[in-house]
Swiss-Prot record:
InterPro entries reported in the protein's UniProt record: ATP_synth_csu_bac/chlpt, ATP_synth_F0_csu, ATP_synth_F0_csu_DDCD_BS, ATP_synth_F0_csu_sf, ATPase_proteolipid_c-like_dom, F/V-ATP_Csub_sf
Any single GO CC term annotated in Swiss-Prot or TrEMBL for this entry: plasma membrane
Species lineage: Bacteria, Bacillati, Bacillota, Bacilli, Bacillales
Keywords annotated in UniProt: ATP synthesis, Cell membrane, CF(0), Hydrogen ion transport, Ion transport, Lipid-binding, Membrane, Transmembrane, Transmembrane helix, Transport
NCBIfam families per UniProt: ATP_synt_c, PRK06876.1
PANTHER family per record: ATP SYNTHASE LIPID-BINDING PROTEIN, MITOCHONDRIAL, ATPASE PROTEIN 9
The UniProt record lists the keyword Transport: yes
Keyword hit for Transmembrane helix: yes
Protein name as annotated: ATP synthase subunit c
Subcellular location, principal: membrane
């Protein structure tokens, strides 16, 4: 049971992060296409957003390990 819970935790967190990263990058590319002069600011905001989104799979892996080794 713990193995299935760990797999679900990792899978769903990776799925959510992938969708989130795709949306962030697509909106950034769209913004740069509309206003090329704002590229630097948009890119820095994008990297901050991607960093926050990538925290989700890390937390998912930690929860999976806690479930496996409990």
């Amino acid at each position: 049971m713990g193995l299935i819970a760990a797999a679900i935790a990792i899978g769903l967190s990776a799925l959510g992060a992938g969708i989130g990263n795709g949306l962030i990058v697509s909106r950034t590319v769209e913004g740069v296409a509309r206003q090329p002069e704002a590229r630097g600011q948009l890119m820095s905001i994008m990297f901050i957003g991607i960093g926050l989104v990538e925290a989700l799979p890390i937390i998912g892996v930690v929860i999976a390990f806690m479930t496996l080794f409990q």
